[in-house]
């Protein structure tokens, strides 16, 4: 019976310790992801803005 109790206690303790360790790592990792996402969003916005302008220019030149 003590084996079962020990089995229950160990999993409960492990996630707490891992959560604390992962918190620091997760914070740094999340910050990196946020920075990368911001860069990607900026690039996407620039690319999206340039895309329609380029196609619009082609269409206009085609009409002329």
Swiss-Prot record:
This is Translation machinery-associated protein 7. Expressed in dermal papilla cells with aggregative behavior. Belongs to the TMA7 family. Residues 1-64 are annotated as: Disordered. InterPro entries: TMA7. Disulfide bonds: none annotated. The gene is TMA7. It comes from the Eukaryota. Residues 27-45 have a biased composition (Basic and acidic residues). Pfam families: TMA7 (PF09072). Keywords: ADP-ribosylation, Coiled coil. The modification ADP-ribosylserine is found at residue 61.
């Amino acid at each position: 019976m003590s084996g079962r109790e020990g089995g229950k206690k160990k999993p409960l303790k492990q996630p707490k310790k891992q959560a604390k360790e992962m918190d620091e790592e997760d914070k740094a990792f999340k910050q990196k992801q946020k920075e990368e996402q911001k860069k990607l969003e900026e690039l996407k916005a620039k690319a999206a803005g340039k895309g329609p302008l380029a196609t619009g220019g082609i269409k206009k030149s085609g009409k002329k």
